[in-house]
Amino acid sequence: CIMFHILKNYIDRNFNLLSFIAVVFCFVPLFYFSTNYVLNGWSYSDALINYSEGFIRRGLLGEIIFNIHKVTNLDIQKIHAYIFIFFTIINIFLYVLILKNISNIRFVYIFLLFNPLLLFFPLNDTGGYLRKEIIILTLMIFHCYLCNKYHSDKLSLSKYFLIFKTLIIPGIIINTLIHDIQLFLIPFHFILTLNVINKDFKILSYKNTFNKKNIILLFYIFTTIPFFIFILYPVSPEKINLIIKNVLLADPQ
């Protein structure tokens, strides 16, 4: 009985840490196989698009992978796997932190943590793993975490603005260069910032439109820069074929 109470108290005190460890442990087999096998041929080939023949949409991640390969001489497939293991662990960590703040009911917490349609989706469908969307999801979860911290009075408005300008906006631009689907998710980040500025969305009323705090929203204009770059550098079949040849030379897989 005493041991039971000691164990219960330990679990209660460290529930979030244990939750994080449990989820990561569930992902270990997927992490292992991803470093030894190509789990998703389409997403792997998509990740290796790079700037070897000049600028191209979705080419940033591939450029990073090949530059790491040149510096470290690590296997390209393993570099690709390690990058996604890194971002998946970050996603799990941030997700647990958000759940810690929004759910005091243990059953709801566990349901959201192990829901097969949420964090555990890649375990149910490995085709959903190793996709660039995981990196985009990292920024979305991180922004949600910041908003949660702000509304919990654990993050000041000035600190939010600083992180917003130095991480969120550059992160959106970088993610767009990795995968152009990020352009369609800019409204998600915009609404989160809107919610920080005024949780009642009073900004939508005319008299609040020109509030000084609202100037921060103009930073979202910078997130459209990649869109215009894409227009200036259209994709051509010739360029794609040359990139494919370069990739096959470096990684026959």
Question: What are the residue ranges of the model-derived segments?
Answer:
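Perimembrane helix-loop-helix junctions
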Residues: 186-221
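Specific aromatic-rich, kink-prone transmembrane helix
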Residues: 134-154, 164, 188, 195
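Membrane-interface alpha helices of multi-pass inner-membrane proteins
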Residues: 162-180, 185-187, 191
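Transmembrane-helix motifs of polytopic, lipid-linked glycan transferases
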Residues: 82-105, 142-146
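Transmembrane-helix signature of polytopic, membrane-embedded enzymes
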Residues: 96-119, 159
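Short hydrophobic/aromatic helix or loop-helix immediately within or flanking a transmembrane segment
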Residues: 52-86
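Aromatic- and kink-enriched transmembrane "portal" helix at the membrane-lumen/periplasm boundary
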Residues: 59, 110-138
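Membrane-lumen/periplasm interface segments of specific transmembrane helices
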Residues: 27-37, 211-253
